[in-house]
From Swiss-Prot:
SUPFAM superfamilies recorded: Radical SAM enzymes
Complex and partners: Homodimer.
Co-factor binding details: Binds 1 [4Fe-4S] cluster. The cluster is coordinated with 3 cysteines and an exchangeable S-adenosyl-L-methionine. Binds 1 [2Fe-2S] cluster. The cluster is coordinated with 3 cysteines and 1 arginine.
Residues that coordinate or bind [2Fe-2S] cluster: 128, 159, 219, 295
Domain Radical SAM core: 67-291
SMART domains (UniProt xref): BATS, Elp3
Entry GO MF terms: 2 iron, 2 sulfur cluster binding; 4 iron, 4 sulfur cluster binding; biotin synthase activity; iron ion binding
Reaction(s) the record says it catalyses: (4R,5S)-dethiobiotin + (sulfur carrier)-SH + 2 reduced [2Fe-2S]-[ferredoxin] + 2 S-adenosyl-L-methionine = (sulfur carrier)-H + biotin + 2 5'-deoxyadenosine + 2 L-methionine + 2 oxidized [2Fe-2S]-[ferredoxin]
Pfam families listed in its UniProt record: BATS (PF06968), Radical_SAM (PF04055)
Pathway: Cofactor biosynthesis; biotin biosynthesis; biotin from 7,8-diaminononanoate: step 2/2
Protein name in UniProt: Biotin synthase
Species this chain originates from: Psychrobacter sp. (strain PRwf-1)
Superkingdom as given in the UniProt entry: Bacteria
EC number: 2.8.1.6
């Protein structure tokens, strides 16, 4: 069997010689989520790097079109002065004296729509909108609902990240037609208190549960390289894979250390995580959450073409387009276009939810 045939037939029973009996087989199909244990995830992390990437790419091709990537654009619709104290974030009001970030009010709706039109013209299929809030207020909800409707009218998928949500707010976003809601876990439960103190881990899980129950697709990921251990990365993957339904979209961020933030200063002082460990995390995420989109998010700006190519080989199939992610830099659009052409990557078309209205009851539902 040739190497290429092995890639196309990841279910083959061929195994590596001398492979530990407890380890995941190189060519196994992705396990059911019920079969994923902490030991299984730890063994994935311990696999030889090339074997892990080969396995992850095989799993990826079982569930997604090879070389197709979903492209998103992210816009900050309200910047800075956030009451949360996330140790990595320049938008926190707790760090404004050391980061120098200038807070901005909510963007006018017409400016957001203009940005969405530019995103669509550039090739993005999803438009993501983020606000530096602990949670949206009642007066914010009509504003965000209008944004969702206007962006969907352009034929784009919609995503929002607005902080914590109540069950009622989740329902309001669903009624407006929101496709995805982002609420990252950031790290493991064990390391979480080193990252933020103003929002608990369980509160994050509660918001994700509200979003899931409302019928909105869940987007939830991590930030790798904040000083956490591999054990924390194992626990984070297990948390997602153990959910009744893992997130449809999983961003795996590589920390961009921002001077003036507690975690940024810590990493700049102690040294950054090797990029290959971030790529390992992507591969393990792909294997354990095989039906989820795995997105390259923050941290790409500093990566070489080869490092990003390895990330796509590891099973990533989504990334953010545009020169800026909220307040941090991103790889330039022209550079991404060049890289996609070089790697043979193909943009995926948008698949926004459709609103169906029952002719008798008038009830609206999403397809």
């Amino acid at each position: 069997m040739s190497f290429l045939a092995t890639l196309k037939e990841p279910g083959t029973s061929v195994c590596l010689k001398n492979e530990p009996a407890q380890s995941p087989s190189l060519h196994d199909h992705a396990p059911s989520t019920a079969a994923i244990s902490r030991e299984y995830i730890a063994n994935l992390f311990d696999m030889p790097f090339m074997d892990l990437l080969l396995k992850a790419q095989g799993v990826h091709r079982q569930h997604f079109t090879a070389n197709a990537v979903q492209i998103s654009t992210l816009l900050s619709i309200k910047t800075g002065n956030c009451p949360e104290d996330c140790g990595y974030c320049s938008q926190s009001g707790h760090h404004r004296d050391t980061t120098g970030l200038q807070a901005e009010k909510r963007l006018e709706i017409d400016k957001v729509i203009a940005a969405a039109k530019r995103a669509k013209a550039s090739g993005s299929s999803r438009f993501c909108m983020g606000a530096a809030w602990k949670h949206p207020s009642a007066k914010d909800m009509p504003y965000v609902a209008e944004l969702i409707k206007e962006v969907k009218a352009l034929g784009l998928e919609t995503c929002m990240t607005l902080g914590m949500l109540t069950a009622e707010q989740s329902e309001q976003l669903a009624e407006a037609g929101l496709d995805y809601y982002n609420h990252n876990l950031d790290t493991s439960r064990r390391y979480y208190d080193e990252v933020v103190s103003t929002r608990s881990y369980d509160e994050r899980l509660q918001t994700i549960n509200h979003v899931r129950k409302s019928g909105i697709n869940v987007c939830s990921g991590s930030i790798v390289g904040m000083g956490e251990s591999r054990e924390d990365r194992i626990d984070w993957v297990l948390e997602l894979a153990s959910m009744p339904l893992p997130p449809e979209s999983i961003p795996v961020n590589l920390l961009v250390p921002i001077q003036g933030t507690p975690l940024g200063d810590k990493v700049l002082s102690e040294g950054q995580l090797p990029v290959l460990e971030w790529i390992r995390t992507i591969a393990v995420t792909r294997i354990c959450c095989p039906s989820s989109y795995v997105r390259l998010s923050a941290g790409r700006e500093s990566l070489s073409d080869a490092e990003q190519a390895l990330a796509f080989m590891a099973g990533a199939n989504s990334f953010f387009y545009g020169d800026k992610l909220l307040t941090t830099g991103n790889a330039s659009q022209s550079n991404d276009d060049r890289m996609m052409q070089m790697l043979g990557l193909i943009p995926e078309a948008p698949k926004p939810k459709l609103t169906v209205i029952d002719a008798l009851s008038g009830h609206q539902s999403q397809l």
